[in-house]
Amino acid sequence: MSDPIWKSRIIPAEQALPGRADALSPTTSHAITGREIKADTPEGMQEIFLGLGCFWGAERLFWETDGVWHTAVGYGGGTTPNPTYQETCSGATGHAELVRVVFDPEMLSLDQVLKIFWEGHDPTQGMRQGNDRGTQYRSAIYATTPEQLVAAHDAAARYQAELDGAGLGTITTEIVKAGPFYYAEDEHQQYLARNPSGYCGIGGTGVVCPIGRHAPT
């Protein structure tokens, strides 16, 4: 059993669970598109990994968005290789629950993706999101290109100004280059498509993010 302290701060790498050599590869197809869950990113499209609380509801935000080609959920940002859901929820892996978002930048700009991200959760809550508490629920942007990193930091600064104006707190979102991404088990992929009345714990601040207002040209 993990120490409860790792629910409120990320466990040091040397204390994290050892994990396993073999990946827990999903075997089902995407419930919305029918594509393989681990589908490669097509040429010309972009991939980004986003953490905004429980990945069940977070994934739905993106598969419902025009211009998003593919989504999948998994774990990243921590230490333990090939973790399970239970291990991640224990706080002993250091991972966040993430959504892999693959989008067509000719239909949906990066700023529009980030706008959905910022407005879709409360990025000021640290190691929790609403009633969901633990390091796995932290706000995170794991970028796959230098351009994404720059855009994410710029968007964070602009959104912080709006949050300040609304009297809200400081953004705690982790914005870094993406590391390994580990796919979650079958039952978590497109969970709310397979379980329409299932739990969705995410919710935004109500503050509009002043980016991504125009379609790509």
UniProtKB/Swiss-Prot annotation:
Any single GO CC term annotated in Swiss-Prot or TrEMBL for this entry: cytoplasm
EC number: 1.8.4.11
Keyword tags: Oxidoreductase
GO molecular function: L-methionine-(S)-S-oxide reductase activity; peptide-methionine (S)-S-oxide reductase activity
Biological process annotations from GO: cellular response to oxidative stress; protein modification process
Catalytic activity: L-methionyl-[protein] + [thioredoxin]-disulfide + H2O = L-methionyl-(S)-S-oxide-[protein] + [thioredoxin]-dithiol; [thioredoxin]-disulfide + L-methionine + H2O = L-methionine (S)-S-oxide + [thioredoxin]-dithiol
Family statement: Belongs to the MsrA Met sulfoxide reductase family.
Organism name: Maricaulis maris (strain MCS10) (Caulobacter maris)
Domain of life of the native organism: Bacteria
Gene name as annotated: msrA
Function: Has an important function as a repair enzyme for proteins that have been inactivated by oxidation. Catalyzes the reversible oxidation-reduction of methionine sulfoxide in proteins to methionine.
Annotated catalytic residues: C54
Keyword presence, Oxidoreductase: yes
Name of the protein in question: Peptide methionine sulfoxide reductase MsrA
